[in-house]
A protein has these predicted regions:
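N-terminal membrane topogenesis motif
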Residues: 1-39, 99, 237-258
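Interfacial/gating helices of multi-pass transporter permease domains
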Residues: 18-21, 45-68, 196-202, 245-251
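Small-residue-rich midsections of specific transmembrane alpha-helices
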Residues: 60-83, 145, 259
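Transmembrane-helix boundary and interhelical linker motifs in polytopic inner-membrane proteins
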Residues: 72-106, 159-164
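Short membrane-interface helical motifs at transmembrane helix boundaries
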Residues: 114-134
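Alpha-helical transmembrane segments of multi-pass membrane proteins
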Residues: 129-153
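Membrane-interface junctions at transmembrane-helix termini in multi-pass inner-membrane proteins
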Residues: 147-169
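Membrane-interface helix-loop junctions in multi-pass transport and translocation proteins
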Residues: 164, 175-228
Length: 259
């Protein structure tokens, strides 16, 4: 049975076509995101002016710690979920894949709460005596609330050979992050009180804004595909007797080597 969630009026695509199409989407999303990431620095640097070097140092230090939390909470999850969902689909066990989606998303949301709380509470310790870093770290705690769930949903769609949702959501996430970052930096440094620390805090908080938009797009896509998913679930063989814990442990085993 066709595992892709493509339009109902379109003929099924071959594995080769799906692979090429998926690679094209992921490559395009990555290229556009990198281009945006390179361009935004120019106006950001200009508007920060003489405070740029200090602001950039705070920004970079914040993201270094944030990246560690991100690796711990999400590393390997999209690939592991994609592999498991594809395996269940190949077996005709679509219902098991949906169980993974629902319970996995909840588990990753709990992971997000724990990661967010840990970074928020540890901010004074992580700041190592630099009080300016505390609000920077805490602004970066917020995206940790959403990104674990976001990564699992992307992996779920990849398991159906649907790369477009991941690529487009990553692009939208990047656009929203950069727009918020630049708008707030301009409002503070050009039209406001020139508080560079406040500009940095909003620049790092922009990661949360991006995550909201990226997650929102994936939720919309999921709702639109729900009827097709329900049809596949109704056709599920249901011959696989596996508990929720076993499903999640299998995903963890796939993901942990990537950490």
């Amino acid at each position: 049975m066709e595992n892709s969630l493509g339009g109902g009026t379109q003929p099924p695509r071959s594995d080769k076509e799906k692979m090429i199409r998926g690679s094209a989407w992921m490559t395009a999303g990555s290229v556009f995101s990198r281009i945006l990431g390179a361009i935004y620095v120019i106006p950001w640097r200009i508007w920060l002016g003489a405070a740029f070097l200090t602001a950039n140092a705070l920004f970079t230090k914040g993201y270094q710690i944030y990246s560690l939390f991100l690796i711990i909470s999400t590393a390997g999850v999209p690939g592991a979920v994609s592999k498991q969902v594809a395996r269940y689909n190949a077996m005709g066990e679509y219902k098991t894949g949906m169980r993974l989606f629902y319970h996995g998303t909840f588990a990753m949301f709990i992971m997000g709460i724990l990661s967010c709380g840990a970074m928020w509470l540890l901010a004074p310790l992580l700041a190592a005596g630099d009080a300016r870093m505390i609000p920077v770290f805490r602004s970066l705690a917020w995206p940790l609330l959403l990104i674990p769930s976001l990564s699992l949903i992307r992996g779920f769609f990849q398991g159906y050979n649907e790369m477009a949702p991941s690529a487009i959501s990553q692009f939208i996430e990047q656009v929203a992050r950069i727009l918020y970052m630049l708008v707030m930096t301009y409002a503070i440094m050009v039209a406001g009180n020139h508080d560079y620390l406040n500009a940095v805090v909003h620049s790092t908080f922009a990661a949360f804004i991006g995550a909201v938009f990226g997650l929102g797009l994936l939720v919309v896509y999921f709702v639109r595909q729900k009827p097709r998913l329900d049809t596949l679930v109704a056709q599920s063989k249901q011959a696989l007797n596996i508990s929720v814990n076993e499903i999640l442990v299998d995903v963890a085993r796939q993901a942990i080597p990537f950490i």
